[in-house]
């Protein structure tokens, strides 16, 4: 089932692999998504523990498939029924990776040559996602680290666990294990930056398909780029080159508190001594007349442990447990999508990426299999979204 929420937004209800198979090849400019991580979140199997129903694959010819994953007739029997929770089982990890590869293969097909895909992953399982994306045919170009300061550690108190263990009815001493735990505080989410291989050179590809590069100028780090921060003195003209580390406000404050302020002198762009030096670039950099904490070198976005009501739609008591900040998703969409382009999110959730795309002057296609989340997307767009005035005039300009 497909729903047209705006002229610029279409949402498909169904399994992402099945829906993607029905989309034309080379029909989207970018993919920005937050797929299942293959873990449990705060005790909730928010990934959808029944992934197994949609990962029946014919991998009977795969010699790499772990023992125990084959069905009674030699075919591949998905083990990703456990993908909704983190498991140390190689079989379950393999099943999650194979499922990621299956949807990534379809994502590769529907992307235009040179199109980028940004896909978030979990810190414990994103290596499986990255391998799957690469095995599907993408080039892994980079990774982005989204740092935040509001994570909650899920750790076992080792001393308490030892103290509660009893041998022959006697308590075991736990003094030696005071202060020990089993987990770190989660403070980052990785994002795989992948690109469908180019057809020819970068110049050939962008002229033919309109994609293939990153919109650097639209994502530069400006001195006044974050509200409510006192980390800058002075102002940059064009802004710094965007980095592959993104901060929330709390992470930015912590970074600035632990490091002294520094200044950047004003000057002209530096040039290589000879043409072709500096990795083929004549201009090799510029100086900035500003000063402040080290957070000024990174993009900073407002983050709340629980997204505000404006960014977290709720219908009938149902809400999505993992809503990314809208400003973050707008920055990512802007980075990899030409103005007026089509953004695809195969795991739409409550529709944050779709809203981000529209707000940035792009079209959006979303896929969501959970019926309970569809009203959240409808509610998000029913509240009204500021749409660039010339967005809907693009049809007449490009047709």
Residue spans for each PLM region:
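S-adenosyl-L-methionine-dependent nucleic acid methyltransferase catalytic domains
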Residues: 1-399
